[in-house]
Amino acid sequence: MKYAFFFFYATGISIIFGSCRIRDKQLPDVSISNPAQVLFDNEIQEAQQLLKEGDLVLRNGNEFSSQLIKNFSKTDKTYSHGGLVFFENGYPLVYHILQGDQNPDEKLRRDSLKRFCNPRKNFGFAVYRYDLDSIQLARLKKTIHDWYIKGVRFDPLFSLETDDKMYCSEMIRKSLQIATDGSLVLKTTRPTKKEADYYTYYLKLPASYIVNMNFVAVDNLFLNPKCRMVKRYEFDPQQALTGGQKK
């Protein structure tokens, strides 16, 4: 009994620290069987009809690294990643930045909504909308496009001081600030000492650095008077690896 407990304890520790490297296994885009496929496709089609330029799409990742990212949020820990929507030839694409096997070059990228919300890797997603006028939306789109062409990369230091490297929520915060001439500035979050000690394994940064870091948590993106939810979609947890289903 003692040896069995030690085996499971050691195995659990290995899984946790191995996952902190953000090297989650790459899964196929979306290849799920009926009827789950039909349900998920219907949700994506519905969401695409609702999307407008500049919309914020948030997803609720089901991987270990996603769970850690959710914990950076102080108030609402539902979401782990986000991106901004812009239309190309009438088709909506989600612009976002991430690292790991899903994005080896770590550059700002754009994905279809279907790929971004893949039910194999997410519990669900939501669409939010900022209160922006047409001029601000045009500036927002130009800013993100300029960064995309420039090839802005993921920032492993999570520093708000650099613009050539950014993480996803930082990119969204800065682009909104530019688009609105500073009238919309999203709040930031500062980790506690206890949180800094915990996150040091995940971020690969000293706790002394993390505790002094102003971080744009995912809930900072939507817990704002100028941001409202359009619609939220949840996949059935029992079908997380086989398909998407709305509760």
Can you annotate each of these PLM segments?
Residues M1-L27:
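Bacterial Sec-dependent N-terminal signal peptides
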Residues G18-K247:
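Cysteine-nucleophile amide-bond enzymes
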